[in-house]
Amino acid sequence: MSETPQKTTHFGYKTVAENDKASMVADVFHSVAAKYDVMNDLMSFGVHRLWKRQTIASSGVRKGHHVLDLAGGTGDLTAKFSQLVGETGQVILGDINSSMLKVGREKLHNLGLVGNIDYVQMNAEALPFPDNSFDLITIAFGLRNVTDKDKALRSMYRILKPGGRLLVLEFSKPEHEILSKAYDFYSFNLLPTMGKLVANDSESYKYLAESIRMHPDQDTLKSMMSDAGFEQTTYQNLTGGIVALHRGFKY
């Protein structure tokens, strides 16, 4: 009897066993966690803060809301949401990577943000919450690292409350050819060098560049969100499409 072929997926440009991807992504983020915030500022020239500000402005978050900041890493979005939901609300910073959670927890504690934030290690494909739990779910620069994106989107849909929204902030496809070529040169030449100099890890930043190119484009992700059940799904290109902010609702 022949064995069932092993399912494969991509890890950057490499083809790997589906069951191996999560641990390989974990190794990347264990490696970069300590320098993650510094590298974000360097890589984006600080523009990531504007992208996140736009995400917060699109969130509709109010006092008393329950928010899941999925793949929340070092907690930039969680910090702001904690202030917006107030004492009667709750923010959960969720991440599959323990090193990223540790850095995020320490950073937010140092900012004095305690009381309405919980930290949970979780897999986006099987979120450990009851149905209809959250008013808002955000996933910023995390979806491209998920092995089964469709499964993760269905899991997010399940735990959103009716009327709740999902915001996906992610690298995407530049709108113009000239920008795309310049972005490719930067990503594949300068980014790994920066990673080597600052984080002593060029390979992780090579993976970062490759994972961005393998991520679904704007319209494909919009369709994936609709297929998962989301309605009124739209996206907004930021910085010429280098990043896109997708939004969908559950009714």
From Swiss-Prot:
One of its GO terms (biological process) is menaquinone biosynthetic process. GO terms for molecular function: 2-methoxy-6-polyprenyl-1,4-benzoquinol methyltransferase activity; demethylmenaquinone methyltransferase activity. S-adenosyl-L-methionine binds at T74, D95, N123, A124. Pathway: Quinol/quinone metabolism; menaquinone biosynthesis; menaquinol from 1,4-dihydroxy-2-naphthoate: step 2/2; Cofactor biosynthesis; ubiquinone biosynthesis. It holds the Pfam family Ubie_methyltran. SUPFAM superfamilies: S-adenosyl-L-methionine-dependent methyltransferases. It comes from the Bacteria. Keywords: Menaquinone biosynthesis, Methyltransferase, S-adenosyl-L-methionine, Transferase, Ubiquinone biosynthesis. The keyword Aminoacyl-tRNA synthetase does not apply. It catalyses: a 2-demethylmenaquinol + S-adenosyl-L-methionine = a menaquinol + S-adenosyl-L-homocysteine + H(+); a 2-methoxy-6-(all-trans-polyprenyl)benzene-1,4-diol + S-adenosyl-L-methionine = a 5-methoxy-2-methyl-3-(all-trans-polyprenyl)benzene-1,4-diol + S-adenosyl-L-homocysteine + H(+). It is an enzyme of class 2 (transferase). Methyltransferase required for the conversion of demethylmenaquinol (DMKH2) to menaquinol (MKH2) and the conversion of 2-polyprenyl-6-methoxy-1,4-benzoquinol (DDMQH2) to 2-polyprenyl-3-methyl-6-methoxy-1,4-benzoquinol (DMQH2). Belongs to the class I-like SAM-binding methyltransferase superfamily. MenG/UbiE family. This is Ubiquinone/menaquinone biosynthesis C-methyltransferase UbiE. It comes from Pseudoalteromonas translucida (strain TAC 125). The gene is ubiE.
